[in-house]
Structure formats: C-alpha cells, structure tokens
Amino acid sequence: MRIILILLIFSVNFSYPLYAKIASVIGNPHTQEIYFKVNKDTKNYPASLTKIMTLYIIFDELEKKRLNLNDRVYFSKYATYTQPSKLGIAENDFITVNELIDSLIVKSANDAAIAIAEKISGNEKNFVIKMNAYAKELNMKNTNFANPHGLPNRSNLSTAHDIFKLSSKIIIDFPEYLNRFGKTNTDINGKNYKTHNTLLNKYDHYIGLKTGYTRKSGFQISLLSINEDDYLLGIYFGGNSAKERNNKINFLMNKFRHKDVSKNKENKKLIVKNEKENNKYYKVQTSSFKKIKKSKMHITLLKNKIKILRSFEHEIKKNGRYFISYINVDDHRTAKNLCNEIKLNQLDCLIKTS
C-alpha cells in the first residue's frame, strides 16, 4: 500500500520535460537492495551525472599511483572551448588534480573534465573508451558514454539503475573520498564556487553525490544519505526544476530512510571523522588464531578484499594461546564503518575500546 501511495504522489502534477523521462531508484548501496523504482531501466541523458564515472576513474588512477593529488593538469585549447559550466582556465594554464576533483564535484566544470581526460588518456576519445570499459566491468548494461562531462550528445545515455550501480561502486570502492562530495563550496584560482546541490546546506545527513541538468535531461541527482550505519542512495532523473527535483528526491529518501535524522546545518557529519571521542581509542578485532602465520594471512586477505583497510594500521598481539589481530582507529564511527565493511564480506569483527 505504501508503494502505491508513493507512486500516486510521485505522478501528481508532473509535467514532463521536453525530452526527459521521470525515473528513480532508491536503495542500499552496499547490498544493492532496491526499495523503490520507477522506470529504472529507461534510457535517459545522464547530463553531469556522467562525471561520477570520470571521478571514479580519477580515484582509481590515484589508487594505482598513476596520478597524484599534487599533479598539474594543463588545459588544452580544446578544453578551453568546452561549453559551460566551466572554470574558464586559460590555454596552457593548470590546476592540480586535487583542485580538479573539487571542480568536478562542486562547480561541475566541463572544461576540467576534458582536461583530466586528456591527462589520463591522451585525448577525449581514448578516455571515453576507458569510461565504457569501466561501465561494462560495473555491469552498467544500458549505458553508453560519449564524453567525460555529460554535455548533450545523442549517444550519451544511461539509466537510473545504472547510475545507482556506478554511485554504489564509488561509495564502496573509494570511501576515503566521500567527504569531498559533501563540500558546499571550494576555492580554485582565487575564485569561490558554490555547490549546485542545495540539499547539502539544509540537511546534515546528505553527502553529495552529484547533480546534473541539460534541457534534454531535465534536473537530476545522485544523492547519498548516511545516518550512523544507515546508508541510503537515491537516483532521480527528469525534474522540471532544481526545486522540484530536490523536493521529490527528499520525499522519497525520507520515506525509505530507516532512522530519524537531525537537520542541524552547523554540524554536518561526514562518513569518517578523525576526532577522538572522550579520549578513547578503538580497536577493530579481525581475527584470533593460535598461529601467527594465520593471523598475518588473514590480514592480507582483508586488505585484498577491502581496499579501505589498506590505509589503516594493523597489529597482532598475543593473548594467552591466541594471536589477536587489530585495526587501530581514533573514533567509534570509523570503527563501526570498518566493521560493517568487513561483515559485508562475510567476515567477522569485534569493536573494543582502550
């Protein structure tokens, strides 16, 4: 009955954009369980949601050490000719990879998308080939990318379900960058840019991810909500205005969020905080073996299966007859997030304080 009522509310007073079709998916990014769907496999123009794939590739290049956050990204003549939204960087001028990431997320800069495509793959065409190869790996069956920014192109097509898959992967594979999506403004080359996602200023449980708009696509969003251990991801295509898009996605997210959340603007909570809570330190216990060799093998297994664990300190301590392996963290939320990631891989963990 609740789904029927939501579908009725979802359809009332909608005048469809000229080319776009309303589509939405709401679900859990970790389990891929879908709670709500409308036209989830209908092909639409993804507009700037295309940049989520561009960002995924950037993060992957950083992880593989083929890029560094301090690397310079130069703007070619071709990049400077890109249509707005753009930074307007002059030909042969540059920004860093670190700045470019913020420019894609906050400003949604199309010229920056071309510049990074050229840096990674030599030219836009080769980068698009890479984008589609990644899409195939991510099982985005109804997606074809034609550029790295999402400006109008008849061949640049995707679906709400495929963008849900892509957004889920960027959340799972690169959680260390999630706080970047929650930024409401950024400074680049002496200019301050404000986010297009005004929901970030109103609700402290939303963490990005990306908005998009062209005349043919309508207003779109990929939106992540985090409340303690409750992750909810919403995709919405085809709004007639930013206000309508925000109202509709917020309505749907509220219906399917499992826990109540505060609307405190002043204390925006990010996925991982590096603050100490009451001077406590936390340990995530990951294994207990009689032989130290097995403990070491288990740590290697964890690091291979769960990328985020590679950036944390692991230690093994003997307790009686057993060798106990731990991950040391500074706060309870980080401990819970890591433990949840471990459990999602059908492995055990235990949180302890010290």
Give residue ranges: language-model regions.
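Terminal, positively biased "leader/anchor" segments
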Residues: R2-I3, K136, Q285
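Sec-dependent N-terminal signal peptides
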Residues: I3-F14
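Short, flexible loop/turn motifs enriched in small residues
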Residues: Y16-I22, R215-G218
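Active-site-adjacent loops and short helices of periplasmic peptidoglycan-processing enzymes
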Residues: L18-T159, I171
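Local beta-strand/beta-hairpin segments that build beta-sheet-rich folds
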Residues: Y35, Q285-S287
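A mature extracytoplasmic/lumenal domain signature
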Residues: T50, K77-A79, E91-D93, E118-I120, ...
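Extracytoplasmic
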Residues: H161-F164, S168-Y282, K290-S354
